[in-house]
């Protein structure tokens, strides 16, 4: 027990990853039992995250001091710039290193959105969702909308009511901290079950495609994002970027859920001493609309399909794909199947039929063991990186 208290959470997670891989290799029969740990951990995170976001945002807004600014707009600008930059990286990399896919007979099509307007309409409908249904289904746009509305209304409540909201937020935060302490056990189960079920064999056939996807995500995480952060804070961005990748990206990689990683990001933002009025809104919102990894996935797989079919993509169409991929990525959390089911929408730019596009989606699910994990790690870590950058930029301006 003392060792657990002395050792950092990141170190414990790293040890859990190694143990999980070893167990999957030498004792695969035990992995179904270990998988229970992973599923329980993800379920616990997903269960507490909607309540945490609702209570925390409502408490932060109702107790907001008049005259203080929340700096949400700079965070949203960083989210938009980061997502568009990621889509551009995906397009450029696909043109420099074109990938091909093995496409067979038409696959059974799943129901994906038909147009960009449909994706945006789904997002708008989420805003006016029934609040109870929004909490039950973890619709974070709806949760944020109701939390903001109730928080604004409760600004005029008595001091005792607002203090009760603060106490409620503190209580939920304590529950979250308990769940986060169990992360090493959960990740041990996730790693063991993932490696035992899929292994590395299923990925070799798509080695180049995976290399392009993961290379783009690494480039965005280690080059593009630090550059954006540097422009915002005007000092070395790497201490902040690497800390967020280590503290947020590692857990997101294994949970494969931006929503489940919201509590981890909120705890990290608190440790960084960011403005609570800013991060309590910006991080849950980022889990919904800040999707750099999804933009890369959509652009790379769409261009791989076009290249396989011999379709020549000109510069204007490539630029349009960057914009479409960015818009689609922002709506990815509102579509079952996330970024993969938005690929047919992007493929429609090249005149690729839905039957072929859904085969590309199927390939995406095959490589999802790495693609989805890396995508989520980039998405979720970028939420807290850009939120911190916006807060630090405002502090720098205030000191000038």
From Swiss-Prot:
Signal peptide coordinates:
none
Q: What does this protein do?
A: Involved in the import of serine and threonine into the cell, with the concomitant import of sodium (symport system).
Keyword set for this entry?
Amino-acid transport, Cell inner membrane, Cell membrane, Membrane, Symport, Transmembrane, Transmembrane helix, Transport
What is the protein's given name?
Serine/threonine transporter SstT
Q: Does Cell membrane show up as a keyword for this record?
A: yes
Claim: Cell inner membrane is one of the keywords in the record: yes
What biological-process terms (Gene Ontology) are attached? Answer: serine transport; threonine transport
Question: Gene encoding this chain?
Answer: sstT
Give the bilayer topology: Multi-pass membrane protein
Q: Do you know which PANTHER family this protein is assigned to? A: PROTON/GLUTAMATE-ASPARTATE SYMPORTER, SERINE_THREONINE TRANSPORTER SSTT
Instruction: Name the predominant localization.
Output: membrane
Q: Which domain of life is it from?
A: Bacteria
Pfam families assigned? SDF (PF00375)
Q: Under the GO molecular function aspect, what terms does this record hold? A: neutral L-amino acid:sodium symporter activity
Q: Which residues cross the membrane?
A: 9-29, 36-56, 75-95, 134-154, 175-195, 209-229, 281-301, 323-343, 349-369
Instruction: Give GO cellular component annotations, separated by semicolons.
Output: plasma membrane
The reaction(s) annotated as catalysed by this protein in its Swiss-Prot or TrEMBL entry are: L-serine(in) + Na(+)(in) = L-serine(out) + Na(+)(out); L-threonine(in) + Na(+)(in) = L-threonine(out) + Na(+)(out)
For this chain, the family text in UniProt reads: Belongs to the dicarboxylate/amino acid:cation symporter (DAACS) (TC 2.A.23) family.
Stored Gene3D superfamilies: Sodium:dicarboxylate symporter
Where is this protein localized, as stated in its record? Cell inner membrane
């Amino acid at each position: 027990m003392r060792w657990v208290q002395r050792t950092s959470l990141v170190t414990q997670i790293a040890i859990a990853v190694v143990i999980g891989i070893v167990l999957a290799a030498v004792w695969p029969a035990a992995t179904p039992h270990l998988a229970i740990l992973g599923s329980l951990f993800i379920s616990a995170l997903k269960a507490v995250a909607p309540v945490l976001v609702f209570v925390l945002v409502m408490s932060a807004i109702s107790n907001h001091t008049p005259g203080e600014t929340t700096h949400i707009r700079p965070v949203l600008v960083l989210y938009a710039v980061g997502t568009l930059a990621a889509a551009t990286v995906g397009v450029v990399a696909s043109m420099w290193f074109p990938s091909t896919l093995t496409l067979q007979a038409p696959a059974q099509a799943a129901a994906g959105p038909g147009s960009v307007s449909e994706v945006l309409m789904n997002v708008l409908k989420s805003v006016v969702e029934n609040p109870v249904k929004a909490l039950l289904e973890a619709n974070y746009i709806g949760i944020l909308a109701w939390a903001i509305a109730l928080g604004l209304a409760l600004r005029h409540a008595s001091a005792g009511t607002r203090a009760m909201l603060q106490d409620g937020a503190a209580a939920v935060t304590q529950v979250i901290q308990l769940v986060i302490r169990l992360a090493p056990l959960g990740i041990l189960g996730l790693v063991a079950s993932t490696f035992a079920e899929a292994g590395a064999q299923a990925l070799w056939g798509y080695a180049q495609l995976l290399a392009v996807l993961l290379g783009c995500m690494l480039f965005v995480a280690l080059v593009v994002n630090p550059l954006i952060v540097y422009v915002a804070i005007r000092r070395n961005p790497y201490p902040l970027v690497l800390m967020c990748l280590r503290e947020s990206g590692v857990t997101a990689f294994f949970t494969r859920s931006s929503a489940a990683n919201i509590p981890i990001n909120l705890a990290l933002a608190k440790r960084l001493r960011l403005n609570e009025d800013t991060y309590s809104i910006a991080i849950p919102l980022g889990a919904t609309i800040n999707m750099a990894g999804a933009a890369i996935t959509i652009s790379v797989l769409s261009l791989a399909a076009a290249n396989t079919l011999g379709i020549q993509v000109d510069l204007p169409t490539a630029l349009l794909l960057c914009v479409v991929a960015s818009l689609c990525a922002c709506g990815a959390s509102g579509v079952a199947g996330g970024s993969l089911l938005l690929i047919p929408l992007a493929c429609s730019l090249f005149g690729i039929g839905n039957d072929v596009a859904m085969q590309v989606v199927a390939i995406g699910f095959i490589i999802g063991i790495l693609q989805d994990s890396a995508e989520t790690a980039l998405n979720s870590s970028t939420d807290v990186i850009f939120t911190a950058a916006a807060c630090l930029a405002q502090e720098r301006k205030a000191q000038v």
